[in-house]
C-alpha cells in the first residue's frame, strides 16, 4: 500500500476526508470561493446503484430556503429542513453528496469540474441558500454550458497553481485503481435531509 494521509490503519481510503481536503485547497487558491466556510459543509458519499458513466455524480443540497430563510412554502405548506449539526453543535448549511464509484470513474478533469460545479452553487452570502441567477433557470443561469465552461476555467486555474500533488495523483485514479492502491473506499454517509412542517 502507498502512503496516503487518507488511508487508515485498517487500509481503507477515507473518501469524504479526501474530498474535503480537495475543496479546502481549491478555496485557498481560488478567490471566487473565499466565501465558503467548509466547517459548515458536510460531505457524504452515496453508492451508485449502477456502474455506468451516466447519471448523477454529485449534488449540493442547501439546508435553508431562498435568501437563507429557515422555512419556506412548498406545495402550499410551510416547511423547514430537519437540521444537521457539526460535532461542536453548529448548524450545517450545505450537504455535498458524491456518488461512488460513478464519481471516481470520471477523468481527473471531469472530477475537478464536478466538484467546482457543486461548490459554485453555494450562495455568495453563504447563508444556506443556493447561488441564484436571473431568469427561469436560477440554478445554472440561462446557459448550463456557459456555467460548466466557467468551472473548467476554475479547474485549469487551480491546476496551474501547482496544488498538492498527492491530491492530483488520487484524482487521476479510477475506482478500481484507487482500491488496488489504497484499499476499500469508505466515508461518511449522511441521509438527505427531511422537510418537516413548521410547528
Question: Which residues are covered by each model-predicted region?
Answer:
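Short, well-structured alpha-helical patches and their helix-loop capping segments
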Residues: 107-111, 118, 139, 143, ...
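Short pre-active-site segment immediately N-terminal to the catalytic Zn-binding motif
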Residues: 97-114
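"Short basic amphipathic alpha-helical interaction patches in structured regions
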Residues: 110-116, 130-134
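Metalloprotease/metallohydrolase-associated module, dominated by Zn2+-dependent proteases
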Residues: 2-92, 96-97, 125-199
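Generic "edge-of-domain/loop-turn" microfeature
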Residues: 50, 103-105, 121
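Active-site recognition of the HExxH zinc-binding catalytic motif
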Residues: 113-125
